[in-house]
Amino acid sequence: MVTKTSSGVDLAEIGIFSELSKRELKAVSRLMTELTIKEGATLTRQGEPGREFMIISSGTAKVEIDGQTVAHLAPGEFLGELAVISGTPRTATVTATSPMIIEILNRREFMALLD
């Protein structure tokens, strides 16, 4: 049973999905959409509403809070879960530092998975 996204990320290895069954992981993989992102593109902006949960398949990004870089993200890491789950504004700005492939799950589908 396939538990990987179209770009090859094994969802079972992503912490937020680690407790899901193979059947549930397969359902998640079918809901995800792959996007190609250019270097310098903004994935999220601090203070804006969050509508998507994202997993990095390839490439890197930097995380900034109030203009200060606080982290770097690499393949297999995810972002956007806090704003999607809580409905609060994005807590950070995330910018691609290289070309990227990301997998996206929108808020409605993400919340349906949690029910």
Predicted regions and their residues:
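Cytosolic regulatory regions built on CNB/CRP/Popeye-like sensor folds
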Residues: 1-115
